[in-house]
Regions:
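STAS-typified acidic loop motif
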Residues: 1-27, 44
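Flexible, charged surface loops at secondary-structure boundaries
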Residues: 4-6, 31-35, 63-65
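Conserved beta-strand segments of the P-loop GTPase G domain that flank and frequently precede/overlap
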Residues: 12-14, 38-43, 72-73
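Short, glycine-/small-residue-enriched flexible loop/hinge segments at domain edges that mediate gating
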Residues: 23-53
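Charged helix-capping and loop-helix junction motifs
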Residues: 53-59
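Short aromatic-glycine-(Arg/Gly/Cys) micro-motifs in beta-strand/loop hairpins
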Residues: 60-82
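Short acidic-hydrophobic, aromatic-tinged amphipathic segments that line or gate anion-handling sites
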Residues: 87-95
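A charged, well-structured terminal subsegment
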Residues: 94-110
Length: 110
């Protein structure tokens, strides 16, 4: 796994790691990125068990409570297979667009 900064967005790439390793890695870097919008790119990995999604929901909710965006990218998910409390996109470009829209809404006080 790795992460990089793209403007005001941190993009975390989930490579071929084990899904349990993801949360260890993410928890280790989170204090460095807590003030940024976050995209987690899972690509085509099928790792979305209910317990994995529950952990993502907890992270997402906490991050959104800081008035920041948290989006996951997965090309294998669809809107019916993911809880509504998670912001999801099939592509990285769309995830960036979602964050841009979130920022506009925050700027307008919506």
């Amino acid at each position: 796994m790795n992460f990089y900064l793209d403007n005001n967005i941190v993009i975390v790439n989930f490579n071929n790691s084990l899904k349990d390793d993801f949360f260890i890695f993410f928890n280790n870097i989170y204090k460095e990125i807590t003030d940024k919008n976050i995209i987690i790119d899972f690509g085509e990995k099928n790792i979305f068990s209910s317990s994995f999604l529950d952990k993502l929901i907890n992270i997402s909710t906490s991050h959104q409570n800081l008035n920041l965006s948290f989006v996951i990218v997965s090309s294998i998910l669809n809107s019916e297979s993911i809880p509504q409390s998670l912001v999801w996109s099939p592509t990285l470009k769309e995830a960036k667009d979602l964050i841009e829209m979130d920022e506009m809404q925050r700027d307008l006080g919506l």
